[in-house]
Amino acid sequence: MYTKAVLLAFVGSAAAFNAPMMTVRRDAIATGAAAAVVAPLLRPAGAKMATDSKAPLIELFDERDGCKGPAANKASDVGEPGLCVKVSMQKVAMNAAAAKSVATNYMRK
């Protein structure tokens, strides 16, 4: 009785094994590896890493205290009158003293 059950288990496991599936999977992995090798060569020449360290600088101008100047443009109805936001990209310089201060004061466990 047990031998028949073991024999049926072996036949069932052999039927579940699919050799062509293993070949397809192997081919897919090889194709993916080849694509990973070739991908850097296919990128456009204009796609380069930015080497200039620029970051957005946000300046807020508040004229709500009564400072009235000549209006060059018609005031919009969006937002709060008297507030202006200027965003520009500026080069960021390294500050070793500030980096050391952050490391000593904020990077503690």
Swiss-Prot record:
The keyword Thylakoid applies. (2R,3E)-phycocyanobilin 1 binds at residue 6. Heterotetramer of 2 identical alpha chains and 2 identical beta chains which form 2 alpha-beta heterodimers within the heterotetramer. The two alpha-beta heterodimers are rotated to an open configuration in contrast to the closed configuration found in other cryptophyte species due to the insertion of a single amino acid, Asp-65, in a conserved region of the alpha chain. In the open form, the central chromophores are not in physical contact but are separated by a water-filled channel. Contains three phycocyanobilin chromophores with binding mediated by both the alpha and beta subunits. (2R,3E)-phycocyanobilin 3 binds at residues 16, 20, 27-28, 39. It is a peripheral membrane protein. GO terms for biological process: photosynthesis. It comes from Hemiselmis virescens. This is Phycoerythrin alpha-1 subunit. The keyword Membrane applies. The light-harvesting system in Cryptophytes contains phycobiliprotein complexes. Unusually they are composed of either phycoerythrin (CPE) or phycocyanin (CPC) but never allophycocyanin (APC), with only one type of biliprotein being present in any one species. Unlike cyanobacteria or red algae these proteins are not arranged into higher-order phycobilisome complexes, and they are found in the thylakoid lumen. It comes from the Eukaryota. Light-harvesting photosynthetic tetrapyrrole chromophore-protein from the phycobiliprotein complex. GO terms for cellular component: chloroplast thylakoid membrane; phycobilisome.
